[in-house]
Regions:
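Hydrophobic/aromatic-enriched cytosolic interaction surfaces used to assemble or bind macromolecules
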Residues: 1-260
């Protein structure tokens, strides 16, 4: 369920910073909107996480992660307190469903929850459920296509807890892959002919997994994840230069490797 960045950063909404919590570090980004409907990077920073603080997208040590967030906020110089963050795709169940277009908002919510029971292998009181109407259904003018998303409450609460422990407020919870697509969509819109009929590839390279999405005219036509990432490069540096993992990671980030 992609974030509408224009809505998030509009005048009617409070300022937000984007916060990414990964296995290896936390990152923060603050944007501002220009008059020509483009965005400018105001501040950004990253702070490494202790090993084991986040494992497979799950927060294992709230204090270590919240301390890293406090450090990255200070490093960035941002004074914005409202945060947009996201859940790993692996922690979220998503499903597109078709529903009648003439349902009221309340009836739509009831119908979505009823449909969700078929796809979610947990009790409904254990999950947080959200949905958005994508648009008219492809094969019926009387129906709409709806995207529903659900995640275990405990996983969401852990991310909210580290944000609040850092003195911030979580305002938006998205899905990492959808947020990334929303961002690249903004860039595509600035290309010739708004990128129409052009193929774009989005690579999200994490410490252990690389996610690949191929987009055409706003639709994802192919996506896959590969079990390799930045940690493999760091391990190669360790072997080639005889450094510790921490030293190799620092030099990789700084571009401070010897010529030979």
């Amino acid at each position: 369920m992609a974030l509408d960045l224009a809505s998030l950063l509009g005048k009617k909404n409070p300022p937000l910073v984007g916060l990414d919590i990964s296995t290896s570090d936390v990152k923060i980004v603050e944007l501002s909107k220009s008059g020509d409907n483009t965005y400018r990077l105001e501040r950004c920073a990253s702070e490494p996480l202790p090993k084991g603080a986040v494992v497979d997208g799950n927060i294992e040590n709230i204090e270590q992660v919240s301390e890293a967030i406090r450090k990255v906020i200070k490093k960035s110089g941002s004074n914005v307190k409202n945060v947009a963050l996201a859940m790993p795709a692996s922690s979220v169940i998503t499903k597109k469903i078709i529903l009648p277009a003439d349902l009221s908002e309340q009836a739509l919510e009831v119908q979505v929850e009823s449909e969700a029971n078929q796809y979610i292998p947990f009790a409904m009181d254990e999950v947080s459920l959200d949905f958005c109407v994508i648009g008219p259904a492809a094969n019926s003018v009387e129906d709409v296509e709806v995207m529903l998303a659900a995640s275990r409450k405990e996983k969401i609460e852990d991310r909210v807890a580290v944000v609040e422990a850092s003195g911030l407020q979580a305002k938006i919870m998205d899905i990492e892959s959808y947020a990334a697509r929303a961002s690249i969509s903004r860039l595509i819109e600035q290309q010739q002919n708004a990128g129409r009929d052009q193929i774009y590839a989005l690579f999200q390279i994490g410490s252990k997994v690389t996610y690949i999405s191929i987009l055409l005219n706003g639709d994802v036509v192919y996506e896959r994840d590969q079990q390799f990432g930045g940690n493999q490069l760091t391990q190669d540096i360790v072997r080639n230069y005889g450094l510790s993992f921490e030293e190799a990671e620092a030099k990789k980030r700084q571009g401070d490797l010897p010529d030979s």
